[in-house]
Amino acid sequence: MDFTEAYADTCSTVGLAAREGNVKVLRKLLKKGRSVDVADNRGWMPIHEAAYHNSVECLQMLINADSSENYIKMKTFEGFCALHLAASQGHWKIVQILLEAGADPNATTLEETTPLFLAVENGQIDVLRLLLQHGANVNGSHSMCGWNSLHQASFQENAEIIKLLLRKGANKECQDDFGITPLFVAAQYGKLESLSILISSGANVNCQALDKATPLFIAAQEGHTKCVELLLSSGADPDLYCNEDSWQLPIHAAAQMGHTKILDLLIPLTNRACDTGLNKVSPVYSAVFGGHEDCLEILLRNGYSPDAQACLVFGFSSPVCMAFQKDCEFFGIVNILLKYGAQINELHLAYCLKYEKFSIFRYFLRKGCSLGPWNHIYEFVNHAIKAQAKYKEWLPHLLVAGFDPLILLCNSWIDSVSIDTLIFTLEFTNWKTLAPAVERMLSARASNAWILQQHIATVPSLTHLCRLEIRSSLKSERLRSDSYISQLPLPRSLHNYLLYEDVLRMYEVPELAAIQDG
């Protein structure tokens, strides 16, 4: 049933007269002995109507008609008594009459709301004073979640009410069901004046909610720069961990949410143990996670490591690995990390294959990603197998750059990739001098693949063997550079041959130079 809308056909004649403040009609009805406790669809009786609509004379008549405390304390279906309704509307005279007639200043609704809370919520300071004079409890819960009047006044930034509540003994460290104090509320919602009053009254700037969040953390998260400045100048600790795992700090919140001014405030005050410390999480991860290039650059410019530490919390070995999940900001983030010296390794190449970012794969190769020795061969091969359907977009670049194809010739690669991909891999080897174990695996795969049988049965040409020999004498960083190969004192045809132009043409792989995009 809807308790918020009044249905006229459910209201008694006495209730209607009280609602309209029609003293003459009400007097006649009472003389006729009409009932004063008939409720409408909301459970509202005539006394509720008179209190809500500020019908002072009607209220007096109703109380005189039934002066028992039970009538004065009668509640609507939502648990509101007449005092709640009058307090919410700021009807000072009505509140005074009800209190003097025995209304309970600490009565609660079904949601545990008191008249005091409603007066605060609606900014009714005169009613608030009156309630306090009659014994209203300034402390304790005034709503179902434990949020009380000081929380509400801080949220609404009503300075006069906050000061009054504090003078009357309101507990400045009171907590709701989530462990949140009024000062925390002020910090969370950017209520600078509320925050200043509470700090001046001695409220704890380093209080923590049940989830360990601090006022400084929440202000940094929400981007309230002035509140952050005030908290820091008042002794808020930027190194107080704000989660159970003891790694999250205000600097992480600012970096993740993109609040550059707050980040500038926190960097010089935050202990650098979070940068690369064991079991910590660098705020560089937070900036990458939030996709904020400006925050990332600020952190790196101030000396934070672009490689950070392995982040088990997010499941990434480096900020570059995390960047792969940020599609729209990916290029900018990666470029910034590389600009400040981020190390690229095989895991990053593997992520390129996993997310099919082949242009980045080629870009990482040009940027000097190490091609060996590798510590994560299994992860790379696993993602390479899954990306082998599009091998022409990445494998030629890897092999031409000097990657040892023998690393790929493991059981999983030989058994899983297409015959075309497998033969292409063999083109970069002397397939007649492979290890016996590799030969056995190839023979097993070739047993039902005639093309593979034919290929491994042929003898590599002398020119191919010479190519392998020349390339083996060059370091991979030189093989990556077309310009270096072209400067060798050899005919142009040999330059092209060293770059496997014949193989690329045979497999219809686009010219490497034509797809060296970033």
From Swiss-Prot:
UniProt GO BP: intracellular signal transduction; protein ubiquitination
Function: Probable substrate-recognition component of a SCF-like ECS (Elongin-Cullin-SOCS-box protein) E3 ubiquitin-protein ligase complex which mediates the ubiquitination and subsequent proteasomal degradation of target proteins. Recognizes TNFRSF1B. Plays a role in the down-regulation of antiviral innate immunity by targeting MAVS for ubiquitin-proteasomal degradation. Also destabilizes TRAF6 by enhancing its 'Lys-48'-linked polyubiquitination.
Induction: Upon sendai virus infection.
PANTHER family in the cross-refs: ANKYRIN REPEAT CONTAINING, ANKYRIN REPEAT DOMAIN-CONTAINING PROTEIN 16
Stretches assigned to the SOCS box domain: 441-504
The protein's name: Ankyrin repeat and SOCS box protein 3
Pathway recorded for this protein: Protein modification; protein ubiquitination
Subcellular location, record wording: Cytoplasm
